[in-house]
């Protein structure tokens, strides 16, 4: 199944209420499904102690959020598997209108010697957002064998 990024909203220094207003203004009378950070269940905004998730739900959006965060590597793998699957297929297509998304996918860096995204380069936020969507719809899990304790012989 393909994932199409056809538009983006980039707002610096905004809050959830402002984002809701922008979505409703830009896409009136549309059914919108939001895939937020799972922390939106607990995170309180500056506006009266409401959670980000409750603001989105009360605005009439369908909200799809897991109860807890997937591992960062699982979110990255979910997006990467859409960019290029194991069979060589491409399943993530980004419109040229999505300038920040394209820039973020091209320029994301990682902390030296790790697979941990560098949050200081200005590109992580857009990729995080794409990761929550990708991991919710197309989860990729790496199962690691649990080592069994060995008895001394």
Language-model features and meaning:
Residues 120-141:
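Acidic, Mg2+-coordinating catalytic module of metal-dependent nucleases/exonucleases
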Residues 1-117, 140-141, 150-153:
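Mg2+-dependent endonuclease catalytic cores in nucleic-acid-processing enzymes, primarily RNase H-like
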Residues 145-147:
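Short, glycine/acidic-rich hinge or "gate" loops at secondary-structure transitions
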């Amino acid at each position: 199944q393909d994932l199409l990024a056809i538009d983006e909203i980039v707002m610096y220094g905004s809050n959830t209420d402002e984002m809701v207003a922008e979505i409703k203004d830009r896409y009136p009378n549309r059914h919108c499904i939001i895939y937020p950070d799972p922390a939106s269940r607990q995170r309180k905004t500056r506006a009266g102690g409401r959670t980000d998730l409750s603001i989105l739900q009360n605005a009439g959006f369908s909200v799809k959020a897991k109860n807890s965060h997937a591992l960062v590597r699982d979110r990255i793998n979910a997006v990467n598997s859409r960019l290029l699957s194991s069979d060589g297929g491409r399943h993530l297509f980004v419109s040229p209108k999505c300038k920040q998304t394209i820039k973020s996918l091209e320029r994301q860096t990682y902390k030296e010697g790790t697979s941990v995204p560098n949050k200081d380069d200005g590109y992580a936020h857009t990729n995080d957002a794409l990761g929550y969507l990708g991991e919710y719809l197309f989860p990729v899990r790496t199962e690691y064998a649990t080592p069994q304790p060995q008895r001394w012989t």
